[in-house]
UniProtKB/Swiss-Prot annotation:
One of its GO terms (biological process) is regulation of cell size. SUPFAM superfamilies: Roadblock/LC7 domain. It comes from Nematostella vectensis (Starlet sea anemone). The keyword Secreted does not apply. Regulator of the TOR pathway, a signaling cascade that promotes cell growth in response to growth factors, energy levels, and amino acids. As part of the Ragulator complex, may activate the TOR signaling cascade in response to amino acids. It is found in: Lysosome. It comes from the Eukaryota. This is Ragulator complex protein LAMTOR4 homolog. Keywords: Lysosome. Belongs to the LAMTOR4 family. One of its GO terms (cellular component) is Ragulator complex. Part of the Ragulator complex.
Amino acid sequence: MAGSTYGLDKIAGVQGYLVVNPDGAVLASSGDLENDEKTAGVIVDMLQTASMIPLSGDSSHSLKRLSVHFGNFVLMATVTNQRIFIVKRPTTETE
């Protein structure tokens, strides 16, 4: 997919990434997650569901990051500036 990599290709050990808008549309992608609209949709749904859970009594606190751990990799999603950045990395011994 053409466009900026948003610097995600510089993350150590990255196996793939997605940049998604809040509606789930893929804006940029690479590697194992190249054009993976299904994963994008699932992560957006998970973020929307998780954001409904109050984290504290202070309404200014909101969900900013979500990690989904699998056997040999982790998907990490960060929400910022109306974009969702999803990165796939291998798990390590400490995770």
